[in-house]
Amino acid sequence: MSELKSRIGNSGSIANSGPVSILCYCASSILMTVTNKFVVNTDGFNMFFVMLFAQSLVCTMCLMVLKMFGYAKYRPLNLIDVKNWLPISFLLVFMIFTSAKALKYMPVPIYTIFKNLTIILIAYGEVLFFGGSVTPMELSSFILMVLSSVVASLGDQQAAKIAQPLANNSILSPEYYWMFLNCICSASFVLIMRKRIKLTNFKDYDTMFYNNALALPILLGFSFLSEDWSSENLAQNFSGESLSAMIISGMTSVGISYCSGWCVRATSSTTYSMVGALNKLPIALAGLIFFDAPRNFLSIMSIFIGFASGLSYAVAKQKKVQKN
């Protein structure tokens, strides 16, 4: 079983603290989004699966080092747990890959707004798989989420038309397909992981180790099948700048990998998605600061509508818990 080596008397309470897990998840989410955007925007970079392989490899190696020094314990790979967790690893790969493809073409603020749609899928998924209901206030927040996504796409198209008047900018553009696929994969990942954690009784380090260790052969296989491994393309993708960016990206993935599982375990999958909604405003602002994202009225308005929807959803969930 997974446990952090106890050096502080209240380490157990911290490990099970919902607020602490939420704060750590927010910080790692912001860092991961900004870092991944930097990596995929590196000139000539096109080996997404290799980037994801590097991230999973760094996570796995960090865990092995922690275990070597006695700071972490996790279950060794075994056939039963591998069979139970393999679908999660495939979903994780698809989730991060579609996220990287969407980030390649989408500004960070627009990307974060569309991620709100995942909350709707997760909420109704929880109704379907775990019972419960959706309150009128939750439904109102969902309408705001959809509205923010529509406004964001209009702002994105407006900015694109100014930059490239003859370009075909519509909701049917490839980046929106990648974004919608990412929402489906993300919701499936969170819902199924919650069920599998209960089934396997995994702890945080178990979840982190299995997520990344099982993803390694999957990512490498997809890379060999779909990416260009010619010497010219390798030289283009493994320049000094892209290598440094991938290493940094791998280091940030350690935090998001651990904090995602921690937050789902310490709270719930809906709370996890709700926190992600409230986290959209700082992520979107970070995108405006660090990248050349559209800065027009519609784009800015969509950010605040998205934040309002997340806030509304948070209040709705709190009232629902108090009522029950």
Swiss-Prot record:
Superkingdom as given in the UniProt entry: Eukaryota
Lumenal domain ranges by topology: 35-44, 98-116, 160-170, 226-243, 292-295
GO molecular-function terms, A-Z: nucleotide-sugar transmembrane transporter activity
Bilayer topology: Multi-pass membrane protein
GO cellular component, as recorded: cytoplasmic vesicle membrane; endoplasmic reticulum membrane; Golgi membrane
Compartmental location: Golgi apparatus membrane; Cytoplasmic vesicle membrane; Endoplasmic reticulum membrane
InterPro entries in alphabetical order: TPT_transporter (IPR050186)
Family membership: Belongs to the TPT transporter family. SLC35D subfamily.
Subunit composition and interactions: Homooligomer.
The protein, known as: GDP-mannose transporter
Organism: Candida glabrata (strain ATCC 2001 / BCRC 20586 / JCM 3761 / NBRC 0622 / NRRL Y-65 / CBS 138) (Yeast)
